[in-house]
Swiss-Prot record:
SUPFAM superfamilies: 6-phosphogluconate dehydrogenase C-terminal domain-like (SSF48179), NAD(P)-binding Rossmann-fold domains (SSF51735). This is Pyrroline-5-carboxylate reductase 2. It comes from the Eukaryota. The gene is pycr2. GO terms for molecular function: pyrroline-5-carboxylate reductase activity. InterPro entries: 6-PGluconate_DH-like_C_sf, NAD(P)-bd_dom_sf, P5C_Rdtase_cat_N, P5CR_dimer, Pyrroline-COOH_reductase. Gene3D superfamilies: NAD(P)-binding Rossmann-like Domain, ProC C-terminal domain-like. One of its GO terms (cellular component) is mitochondrion. It comes from Dictyostelium discoideum. The keyword Amino-acid biosynthesis applies. Keywords: Amino-acid biosynthesis, NADP, Oxidoreductase, Proline biosynthesis.
Length: 299
């Protein structure tokens, strides 16, 4: 297969369309910046994504080569252990006009580059969204540079990297909020922005359970708790304020709010959340170290 001219091609291929890959595709379409027929989804078992073609208009294929040849932006969404095989299979078609965006946990930029053609410089960006991207509400961390680069690229490579970062920011800012961090920080990022979705769901579930105990029906309690959490988050983001500032505005002397907050703190609320996030970050770090060892890639 001969590589296609991709200079004016902005189509997106999601190589490995599992839950996160499909959520990304739907979020990009929901943002209004892409149509579904501009996105190619790949999966070995086509039956699992056939409905996305029939009902939502996405292109689908089981052939990663076909997808890479059609699209300039390649989002890598396979399992970490599958990354080397995937990249080796498409590397002869990957050109300097491609942009590779990896949403794979633990695989470094240098690890990805080691499986591409050494004489072709393709810009690579790592991204860590969460599944709320489907509703354009993701918090996505992205990185394409290390705090401690081993060497500087050429001016042309630096320009390609900057363009790739801007393209990635545009895609993910359309699907929520996006922040650029160093690659080193990507080790811990999932604990806050990806695992964090589950943590906040658990907190909302606990609030809803309390709502049931004080007299609300379960469905109403979940709705009240979720919307209240959403409102609190929006206040912080809109006001660009510290959480304690908003708490101070809500609490009153000897009031119900401070009584509830103090009871929660006496029972370890903040400590439990901090310990949980730190534990997730440590687990993420160990997983990356194991992957680096497996692939013989230095982080």
């Amino acid at each position: 297969m001969v590589a296609t001219d991709l200079k004016n091609n902005k189509n997106i291929a999601i190589l490995g369309s599992g839950n996160l890959g499909v959520s990304i595709a739907r979020g990009i379409v929901a943002s209004g910046h892409y149509k579904s027929n501009q996105i190619v989804l790949t999966r070995r078992t086509l039956e699992k994504i056939q409905h996305l073609k029939d009902e939502e208009g996405f292109q689908i294929t089981s052939d990663n080569l076909e997808a890479a040849n059609k699209c300039a932006i390649l989002i890598i969404g396979v399992l970490p252990a599958q990354v080397p095989q995937l990249l080796e299979s498409i590397k002869h078609l990957v050109t300097k006009d491609h942009i590779i965006i990896s949403v794979v946990l633990g695989i470094t930029i240098s690890g990805i580059r080691s499986h591409l053609q050494p004489d072709v410089y393709t810009p690579i960006v790592r991204a860590m969204p969460n599944t709320a991207i489907q509703y354009c509400e993701s918090m996505t961390c992205i990185a394409n540079k290390s705090d401690h680069p081993t060497k500087s690229g050429t001016a042309e490579q630096e320009l390609a990297d900057q363009n790739a970062l801007e393209v990635t920011e545009k895609i993910f800012n359309c699907c929520g909020e996006c922040i650029t961090i160093s690659e080193e920080a990507m080790v811990s990022a999932p604990a806050l922005c990806s695992c964090g979705t589950a943590f906040f769901c658990r907190i909302i579930r606990a609030a809803a359970s309390a709502g049931c105990e004080i007299g609300f029906h379960a469905e109403d309690a979940v709705r009240i708790a979720a919307q209240t959490a959403k409102g609190a988050a929006i206040m912080l983001l809109k006001n660009d304020s510290h959480p304690e500032s908003e708490i101070d505005r809500i609490t009153t002397p000897s009031g119900a709010t401070i009584a509830g907050l103090n009871t929660m703190e006496h029972n370890g609320l903040s400590s439990a959340i901090i310990k949980g996030i730190v534990m997730s970050a440590e687990k993420s770090s160990k997983s990356q170290a194991a992957l680096n060892k497996l692939n013989n890639v230095s982080s």
